[in-house]
Regions:
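Polytopic transmembrane helical bundles with strong interfacial aromatic enrichment
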Residues: 1-301
Length: 301
């Protein structure tokens, strides 16, 4: 949005698309992450905490479905300049393109995640599959379809976003659990931390690999505003990593020792990390709106 508004002839539709895209990233990946958290830790959680995670997954899924529809409307506005937003030809062209493919994949995934709100026996399994489908939907369009190696970039996008989803989607449930003062809560926090470390390592490795594949030469990094968006995103991720390190090495051990107020301090810091993640999603949305300079790896239309 900000990058668009700084152009000589800014488009309100393009600016709106960045905002909607960022919100959609947040809602859909939180939904998927909550589903993954529920699958991994529901057996250890109290019933009330497990129900809270299911509500988060279902609520975020509903929000993401609404935002996905809003994204289509805004995209129609971008394609038509706003004048033909309701024209059938615009929607036909859009829904028969990769935009439509991504929408239907994401919708199927979000509906599967929303099954956690029901008493269906297989709902947790459907939700995990849905989380992976949501991650895959973002590889069905955008940069992963425009640059070589297409299959490699698409695979990295799915892996990267699945890891992002697990990390970010776990934050609100962890903040709720951090306020507890019992052995079960401490065990869940410790178990999550052990799993999260390799997940975050894969997240970082896949993200750096994607950056290297998209920007083939360092001297081309700032040839377009893509490099600025990438730099801001990396800075914000570094802030999240610093907060996560503080949780793992300072606040969580204090909570495990049941120090007075330690759980509340941990919960507040986790919520701050969740807030920073929203800025990461905004930076990612800005990046996707800009193409890196073609270094011979752009796929011809």
């Amino acid at each position: 949005m900000i990058i668009e508004l700084l152009t000589p002839e800014p488009s309100a539709w393009d600016a709106a698309s960045v905002l909607v895209r960022a919100a959609n990233y947040a809602a859909s990946l939180v939904a998927g992450g909550a589903a993954l958290f529920h699958a991994g830790f529901s057996a250890q959680m109290r019933q009330a905490d497990s129900a809270s995670v299911r509500r988060l997954a279902a609520g975020a899924s509903a929000a993401a479905i609404a935002l996905s529809v809003a994204a289509l409307i805004v995209r129609a506005g971008v394609l038509s300049g706003g004048g033909g937003i309701l024209e059938a030809r615009v929607w036909e062209a859009m829904m028969t393109s990769r935009i439509g493919d991504a929408f239907w994949i994401r919708l199927a995934g979000l509906l599967a995640i929303a099954a956690l709100a029901t008493r269906i026996t297989v709902a947790p399994h459907l939700a995990v599959a849905g989380a992976l489908a949501v991650a895959a939907s973002y590889a069905a369009m955008g940069h992963s379809m425009l640059y070589r190696p297409r299959q490699g970039i698409a695979a990295l996008v799915v892996v990267h976003l699945a890891c992002v989803s697990f990390w970010v989607g776990s934050l609100l449930p962890l903040a709720r659990l951090a306020r507890g003062r019992d052995g079960e809560t401490v065990a869940i926090l410790a178990d999550w931390s052990r799993i999260a470390r390799p997940v975050v390592a894969v997240l970082i490795a896949s993200g750096l690999a994607l950056a290297a594949l998209m920007v083939r030469r360092f001297d081309l990094l700032y040839a377009t505003a893509y490099g600025s968006g990438l730099s801001v995103k990396l800075l914000l991720v570094a802030v999240m990593l610093a907060l996560a390190a503080r949780h793992a090495f300072v606040l969580s051990p204090a909570a495990a020792r049941l120090e007075p107020g330690a759980g509340n301090r941990l919960a507040r810091s986790i919520r701050l990390e969740a807030a920073v993640s929203l800025l990461v999603f905004w930076a990612a949305a800005e990046m996707v709106s800009i193409h890196p300079l073609d270094a011979g790896h752009r796929i011809a239309a």
